[in-house]
Regions:
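Small/polar, glycine/serine/threonine/aspartate-rich low-complexity segments that form flexible
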Residues: 87-105, 155-187, 310-330, 359, ...
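Periplasmic alpha-helical coiled-coil/stalk elements that build and connect Gram-negative outer-membrane
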Residues: 198, 214-333, 449, 453, ...
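Bacterial N-terminal signal peptides
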Residues: 53-64
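Sec/SRP-type N-terminal targeting helices
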Residues: 125-126, 142-143, 178, 192-220, ...
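Short flexible linkers and secondary-structure junctions
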Residues: 67-228, 368-373, 378, 395, ...
Length: 579
């Protein structure tokens, strides 16, 4: 450990060989203990010069000292060279940023919903406030690098009960039983960042701040995909309701045919009951689907940050038109996920923050070196004195000196804390690698859903066409008396089922494409040039608290924030404080 200390001291260009404390006529009741003879002018000049050298040395220690602990390096990411369906002509591997992927559906209502959700969603707003929390935490960490000062003031009255009291101050035979004493000064303490504890703390806070931005982007990507998926689900349900109602009209006609044939003696009452049974079952699907539609609308309102209210601009077009997906989509290559997925970036930054924590914990194994000092004045009314003398040269006092603290006996607590931080880092590194694997799985799932749902829909279109033809022929032959009613019932049910399945498959195609875009990490760019909280929230917080430049006033541009941040976006470990 001593070798480590010497190496760091040599790197900083500093040699500690003793203890230094300077004092200028310090009042013993206010200042630190005094070493030396402050009455000698030459010694006082030497003390001041020594103080200057000490301050310079402290700056060198802070700026050039060692930073104990590992420097973060991301682990290898387990990525495939290509997607499993890379040969499919519907997939393209060119570069694409997916800035506004929802526009591929050419649905102006969906575009409007995305805009509303981005500006009003409360989950996203909550994530934005966490970015501000992390930014303020970074400011706290930066402040630890600098001397901590306090102003101290006080007034004490002394009331001595008797002349026999040992604390009585006397001159000749005269004792002063009551007097006042005043103190005023500045106290400063500066723990030198010799081992990089505070700089590692800045690294931790900076990485956590960038991770909060990446997490915000991940929430935003999830929000946009949820809005699109919910909207597509609503349109799919509307299509299913329209199909059910069309089949109800058709089945009512068949019930009428069965009744007419029964009245004419060409059919039995069984045919009527069977026709009414199928009709009733189909009619029952409408309330069930309406419940599903209402639930989708309720979910959409939450995503839009709205209280329960009619969504007239959406319901006005309740024709069941499901957004159509394009035939081709650009998916890039798996390695692109490492730079494009916000959650992968966040996982990497959390690991980087934890890596710096190892340095913070390891620094506790080494001595903490601080510079302590006071400057102020004191005066008393003793012997005719005046408290105003506190501002006179005769009342001034000054002390400065180093402090040395070393936790040499802690029964393994510090060492085990270092081990704890290291094990936590390893967990975050594994989490990062797992997030890369999970991202690739989600892309593969989305691609499979998108491609195979199109094939499914094509088969179902043929099924619907055949079911329509079968029902038409069965109904005609039943009317002519050449086919029994069971054939008509079967044809009715088959058509309803085929049309319903086609509606679901048609909705699954764009839903699968949305899942692909979500898995590829697109859409976060919508925040470019905007703050992380709404203007109303920013104004509310500014009225409540002085946020300085962290929350610009209305009309001012927000603080610049990196897009999809990574460890390379961290700032310097030594920087100016933020007031």
């Amino acid at each position: 450990m001593l070798d480590k200390i010497q190496r760091c001291a040599a790197a900083a260009g500093i040699c500690f060989s003793g203890t230094f404390v300077a004092s200028d006529r310090a009042d013993p009741g206010f200042a630190l203990p005094v070493i030396g003879n402050p009455e000698r002018e030459a010694d006082r000049r030497g003390a001041v010069m020594g103080l200057g050298r000490g301050v310079v040395a402290a700056l060198l220690v802070t700026l050039a000292g060692c930073a104990i602990g590992p420097d973060f390096a991301p682990p290898p990411a387990p990525t495939a060279s290509s997607w499993l369906e890379w040969r499919n002509k519907s997939l393209q591997t060119g570069p694409e940023e997916y800035r506004d992927w929802w526009r591929v559906f050419h649905d102006p209502i969906l575009d409007r919903l995305i805009e509303i959700a981005y500006s009003q969603n409360l989950t996203l707003l909550s994530a934005g406030t966490k970015v501000l929390q992390a930014r303020a935490t970074l400011g706290i960490a930066v402040g630890e690098l600098f001397p901590q000062q306090q102003i101290a003031a006080g007034a004490i009255t002394y009331n001595l009960r008797s002349l026999s009291d040992s604390s009585v101050v006397s001159v000749g035979s005269t004792a002063s039983a009551n007097y006042w004493r005043g103190l005023l000064g500045v106290q400063a303490a500066w723990e030198l960042d010799f081992w990089g504890k505070f700089r590692r703390g800045v690294e931790t806070a900076d990485s956590a701040y960038l991770a909060s931005i990446a997490t915000y982007d991940d929430v935003l990507v999830t929000l946009l995909s949820d809005v699109a998926s919910t909207y597509i689900g609503i349109r799919t349900t509307e299509r299913q309701i329209a199909i059910a109602r069309a089949n109800i009209v058709r089945q009512r006609g068949i019930v009428t045919i069965a009744r007419d044939k029964y009245k004419g003696g060409a059919a039995t009452l069984l045919d009527v009951y069977q026709a009414e049974n199928v009709l009733g079952a189909t009619e029952a699907t409408v309330p069930q689907l309406t419940i599903q539609l209402r639930q989708g609308l309720d979910a959409l309102r939450v995503l839009l940050g709205m209280a329960p209210q009619p969504l007239g601009f959406l319901l006005a077009r309740s024709t069941g038109e499901i957004p159509a997906a394009p035939r081709k989509v650009v998916v890039g290559v798996p390695a692109d996920l490492l730079r494009r997925r916000p959650d992968i970036r966040a996982a990497e930054l959390r690991a980087a923050a934890q890596s710096a924590q190892i340095g913070v914990a390891t620094a506790e194994l080494y001595p903490a070196i601080s510079i302590l000092g006071t400057f102020g004045g004191s005066a008393s009314t003793l012997l005719g004195g005046n408290l105003s003398n506190i501002f006179q040269p005769s009342g001034r006092n000054f002390t400065v000196g180093p402090s040395f603290q070393w936790n040499i006996l802690n029964y393994g607590q510090i060492t085990n804390n270092v081990r704890l931080q290291d094990a936590t880092l390893q967990q975050y590194l594994v989490d990062y690698q797992n997030s890369v694997l999970t991202a690739q799985q989600q892309v593969e799932d989305g691609i499979a859903t998108f491609l195979l749902s199109r094939s499914q829909a094509e088969y179902l279109r043929r099924s619907v066409a055949a079911a329509n033809g079968a029902l038409h022929i069965a109904t005609l032959e039943y009317q002519q008396g050449t086919r029994d009613f069971t054939t008509v019932l079967t044809a009715e049910q088959n058509l309803l089922q085929a049309e319903n399945n086609l509606a679901v498959a048609t909705g699954t195609i764009p839903t699968g494409l949305v899942a692909v875009f979500r898995a590829l990490g697109g859409g976060w760019q919508i925040r470019d040039g905007n703050g992380f909280v709404t203007a109303a929230t920013s104004e509310e917080m500014r009225r409540r608290t002085d946020w300085g430049q962290l929350l610009p006033a209305a009309g001012e541009p927000p603080l610049p924030a990196p897009g999809l941040p990574g460890p390379e976006d961290r700032g310097p470990t030594v920087r100016a404080p933020e007031w």
